[in-house]
Amino acid sequence: MQHTSRNRIADACAYSLVFLFVYTATAKLFQFNLFQFQLDSFPWIQHVAAVLVWAIPVLELAAAGLLLARRLRRTGLYVSLTLMALFTLYISLMLGSGKHLPCSCGGVVGWMTWRQHLVFNLVFIGITIVGLVYSPSKIKFYET
């Protein structure tokens, strides 16, 4: 595979994640009171919900910013992988608990069942891993 094809694949993965993070962060911020209420109702995070209500959308937007900066893309992909893994772990805990709480994700993602959301997250974890595999480990600051 040519170097440019690898870059295009890495770009597509990064832009998919940017769209996801900007969309969900924006939806959470526009429906802030609902997002806060939903986080407060989750059993394992009630004591930190006041911090998470701000931290989650800020981290999502920060990850998107890192992904857009080509020189910081690998860092953004690692941040994205960490966020998606944490979100997926939480979803797995929710599925295992048998509780029927609403998803606190923003926009149409929030309408998914927990099982659908688990699959959705696993797909985006896969996209992130593909992005890491195909993104260059070193970025040239200038072309010669």
Regions inferred by a protein language model and the residue ranges of each:
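Membrane-interfacial helix-loop segments of redox and metal-homeostasis proteins
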Residues: 1-144
